[in-house]
Amino acid sequence: MNSQHIYDIVGIGVGPFNLGLACLTQPLNELSTIFFDSKDEFDWHSGIMPEGSTLQIPFIADLVSFADPKNNYSFLNYLKLHNRLYQFFIRESFFILRAEYNLYCKWAAEQLENVHFKSFVERIDYDESRQLYTVRVKQPQGEMKVVTKNLVLGTGTTPITPKFCQGYPEQIQSSADYLRHKKDYLTKKSITIVGGGQSGAEIYYDLLSEIDQHGYQLNWLTKAPHFFSMDLGKLTLEYTSPDYTSHFYSLDEDKRDQVIGSQNALYKGIELSFVNRIYDLLYQKSLHQPIPTRMMPNCALDAVEQQSNHLNLTFKNSDINKRFKLESEVLILALGYEYKIPECLTPIRTLINWDSKGRIALNWNYSINDDNTIFAQNIGIYSHGFTVPDLGMGCYRNAIIINTILGREVYPVEKRIAYQEFAPTTEEIVTPVKTTAKSHSTELSF
C-alpha cells in the first residue's frame, strides 16, 4: 500500500457486496481500488449455519456472475479449481450450502491483494479543494492514511436487539451467535426463540431435532400473524429484478414505505420446503408422546425481567390484545438486522443526503451525496426496495457503481427482464377531468 497514491475507490467493510465489487474491479486496469475490514478474515454469518443449511437463492447469484459470468471469481470456477464441480452437478441442487458459500467468499478474498482484514477505519475526512477523501486506518502494524476519489460503504448490518434485552449477555443472545452458544443451550431446561424468519426457523428445527436427548422446553414465538413461507413463485421472483427496482425507486417516499410494509412475504418469510420439514419433524417427534414445545404467532416480546435462574418474558398477543408471561432460562433473538451508520463517517456527515425521515437518501445509482462519490451497499430498502440485501442483486448494484465512477458502461446493466409490467406507460395514464356531473366508479377489487 502506498499512502501517497490516490485510489479511485476505497471500500469500507468486506461482506459479500463489497467483496463482489473487489472481484469485479480486479480486471479493470483503469481503476485503483483498496478494501478494508476490521475482522480477522472474511466471515459471513458463520454463527448461524446449522449443518446442511443453504442459501435461499441459486448459485448463479454469486459474487460476479450476474455482471460478468466469465469472471475468474465465479462460484463455478471456484468449484472447478477445488475439484468439486462434478460433485456439485451430481448433487442436483441450485442452492449452495451456507458453509460452502462462506468458504467460496474466503477463497475469493484470499486471491485479492487489495483486500485487507484486521484494518479498522477510524475516520474519514474530505478535502474540498482537492475533492479527495482521506481515510485513516488502524492496523496491527500501526496507523496509515489512504487518499481516494470515491468511497463505497459495505459495513453491513447488525442484529436487532431491543433496549430492554440489553444487559443480559449470559441469558440473551442473537441468532447470529447461535452456534457459539449451542453447547450451553443444550444444558438448559427451557429455551425461547423470538422471530419467525428463516434464521429463527433453522434454529428451532436444529433444537427440535435434539429435544429428545436433552429434554428442554422449546418455545418459538413471532409477532407475525402466522409462521409464513416466502412467496417464491416465478412471477413473484420478477420483483427481484432491475425492472421492479427502477419502478419502486420512481414512487414517492410515503408510497414506498407503504408498499414495503406490505411485502413481508417476499423477503421475510421461511422457505416453503423448510416449513414443511419443521412440520414433518413435529409429526415424527409426536408419535409416542407429546413434544415439550410451543409455537405461537401474533406474540410480540414486550419486556424482560431477570429472576434468580431464569428470565420472565412478557409478550403481547395481538389477537386478544392481552399480555402474558413465559419463563425461560435463555432467549435467542432472531429479529433480523439493521443498518448502523459507521462512526468513521462523522466528519463527512454533512456531505451525506438525508430523507424527510432522517434516513440516508440514496440516489438511483446508490450514491448518497450530491457529487456521486460516496456509495452505499445494503442500505435503502425504503428507496430501492426489498431486494437491497438480496445477494442476487449485488452484481446489479456493483455494475451501476462501477459504471457511474468510470462514466461509461463497463458492465452492461439489464433494464427490462420481467414479462409483467409494474406500471402503465406515460401515454396510457388518464389525465383527470374536472366535472360537475356525478361520476360512477368502475374500480374492481381483483
Swiss-Prot record:
GO terms for biological process: biosynthetic process. SUPFAM superfamilies: FAD/NAD(P)-binding domain. FAD binds at F17, D37, S38, K39, W44, H45, Q56, V121, N378, P389, L391. Its EC number is 1.14.13.252. It is an enzyme of class 1 (oxidoreductase). The keyword Transferase does not apply. Keywords: FAD, Flavoprotein, Monooxygenase, NADP, Oxidoreductase. GO terms for molecular function: monooxygenase activity. InterPro entries: FAD/NAD-bd_sf, Lys/Orn_oxygenase. NADP(+) binds at T54, Q56, R98, S199, K223, Y267, L301. Its cofactor is FAD. It catalyses: putrescine + NADPH + O2 = N-hydroxyputrescine + NADP(+) + H2O. Homotetramer. PANTHER family: L-ORNITHINE N(5)-MONOOXYGENASE, MONOOXYGENASE. N-hydroxylating monooxygenase involved in the biosynthesis of fimsbactin A, the major siderophore produced by A.baumannii. Catalyzes the N-hydroxylation of the aliphatic diamine putrescine into N-hydroxyputrescine (NHP). Putrescine is the preferred substrate, but the enzyme can also catalyze the N-hydroxylation of cadaverine, with 4-fold lower catalytic efficiency. Cannot use lysine or ornithine as substrates. Uses both NADPH and NADH as the reducing cofactor with a preference for NADPH. Belongs to the lysine N(6)-hydroxylase/L-ornithine N(5)-oxygenase family. Contains an N-terminal Rossmann-like domain that binds FAD and a C-terminal domain that binds NADP(+). The smaller third domain consists of three alpha-helices (residues 70-114) and is involved in oligomerization. This is Putrescine N-hydroxylase. It comes from Acinetobacter baumannii (strain ATCC 17978 / DSM 105126 / CIP 53.77 / LMG 1025 / NCDC KC755 / 5377). The lineage of its organism: Bacteria, Pseudomonadati, Pseudomonadota, Gammaproteobacteria, Moraxellales. The gene is fbsI.
